[in-house]
């Protein structure tokens, strides 16, 4: 894992473990391969600053459920059970939302590494509109 702006490294590992269960890798790449954690970290210091407190409180809630152990240290079935226990909390809901956003947002926002999410849904971004030069540039 690289550098984070909002998360500490242990916090990033917790969110990454959650994201991997929300959008797992199977026959197709998931949240880990799309590097969703970097999208979430960037979101929390830009457009989603108002969600920082939910994350801070949520780390405590998750730690209480895991007995202070990292979520990723548990077998997958236990991780799913632990996340199911908090799935109705604001913390889980926002991590889920941010995970999905990180899978399918434009890569320049930190997630969707190598356009993995777009490839899964067949989105071709080469057709994005760009205004032509010329009369549109004149005042």
Segment roles from a protein language model:
Residues 12-20, 35-139:
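Mature-region segments of soluble proteins
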